Amino acid sequence: MKGILDRLYLKKSGLYAHIRDEADGSFPDGNAWSVGVAWILTGLERTWRVLPEKMVREREDLKERFVSLMDRVLRYQCGDGGFHDVMDDPETYMETETPAMIACAVYAGVRDGLLGEELLAQADAMAAYVRRKILPDGRVMDAASSPAFDRPGTSVECQAHVLMMEKRSGC
């Protein structure tokens, strides 16, 4: 996990890129794609959860990274509970999978003692945002659309994260 975090970290924003050119260490688009950042959050929480308790130093490092990133991410949450496709670019469209994933991470983080209960209201606002994007037939709209993830639409990944969000057990 540390290797991924170190390679994808964007110093200017404190967020993470989703593509890195290993040949020269550059980031082709340099964007903090919100779903990618949400994957980092859910990965940190889940990895912390499954590491043996005897790995104290590693668990503490994951916890610190998780809490720090969650703090940065929540600054980008919009008033309606959602997030932009590029997390730190308000000119991009509002994306639906991101709040589902971050809500999962908050619910799991609170359950596991990594986050305080005061964050539940923000997670609940994310969940409410996501629910407003669900059509009567169950499809979730305005996710980064499969397979290119370059415009709003639907994706099976988003559908799965919405189910996990509703279970409130973490991703």
Q: What role is predicted for each listed range?
A:
Residues M1-A17, K63-G81, Q122-R139:
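Long, well-ordered core segments of solenoidal/helical folds
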Residues M1-E45:
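Loop-centered beta-sheet repeat module
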Residues L5, W48-P52, L74, V110, ...:
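A structural signal for long alpha-helical coiled-coils and helix-turn connectors
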Residues H18-G30, G81-D89, P147-A148:
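Acidic/His metal-coordination segments adjacent to aromatic residues that form catalytic metal sites
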Residues N31, V35, R57-E64, D89-E97, ...:
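A short glycine-/small-residue-rich loop at the edge of a beta-strand within enzyme catalytic domains
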Residues W39-M87:
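Oxyanion-binding "anion nests"
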Residues F83-H84, D89-C171:
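CBM-like carbohydrate-recognition segments
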